[in-house]
Amino acid sequence: MEQSEKTLDMIVNLCKNRGYVFPGSEIYGGLANSWDYGPLGVEFKNNVKKAWLKKFVQESPYNVGLDAAIIMNPQTWITTGHVAGFSDPLLDCRACKARHRADKLIGDEHPEVNVDAMSFDEMDQFIAAHEDIVCPVCGKHDFTPIRKFNLMFKTAIGVTEDSSSTCYLRPETAQGIFVNFANIQRTTRRKLPFGVCQVGKAFRNEITPGNFTFRTREFEQMECEFFCKPGTDLEWFAYWKDYCENWLLSLGIQKEHLRLRDHEPAELAFYSRATTDIEYAFPFTDWGELWGIADRTNYDLSRHQEASGKSLEYFDSETNEHYIPYV
């Protein structure tokens, strides 16, 4: 067993024995990657959330709070592209039938490769050309072609289950903020720039969850969407990068365990001007994303305005012009 695995096992055992975290529904054999926070775990988690809300809402002169619904109108997720394209690259081992994420297999064996910039076809070709990429279960290099696996949990609202009653558990907390932009701006009378923050649960049907509580199908996000005038976005992007990093350091995280990784142009979404991940040196991997900061321009608000037919423009009284804010 590698030292990183020993370290993680020690953390898991400590959390179980001290009442921080228990396996979910343990008396029935548990549920894979489901965890319940015990008495100390609840206090610990609440302290982190309170510290975040204090720093990002109460102490910030720019931000306000929100608690949006977990189940939203399904058109929300059609508009954002989640229904059609929120997916992981799934493949099967032909030898043992185990299922894996293709990007994870490539990244584990070839960390020097930028998997995030690869298409599904490019991943297929890369795996076929590298026989050192084998199934972690049986050790064979024999995989099916990659296919898309949608990560959203589907459910139904009402007494009948048909296409008209289909809804989804939200896979992220950001969209609840975007669809409420006009409501918040109107009722608070805020002028740009301002942000909206919320803490809430999100759900993703991950193919290969794992590593204790660090990758689960049910999790909480601490989200801030900051709205600003176009042309000032990169300045605010730099501001919030520093703000987020400084808050993490204020919690007692050692600086050498954090790093900021700017996304390469090939990694960026077509609507993004810049993205930076704050990565942490987890005990089970070299580095992993802890926090993502992105300049999303006006993409989200523009999409929702177009699909809903409702104006999400902001009137700037200083310049006497209407525009859709950048985020």
PLM ranges: what are they?
Residues 2-327:
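TRNA-recognition modules of translation machinery and tRNA-sensing kinases, especially anticodon-binding
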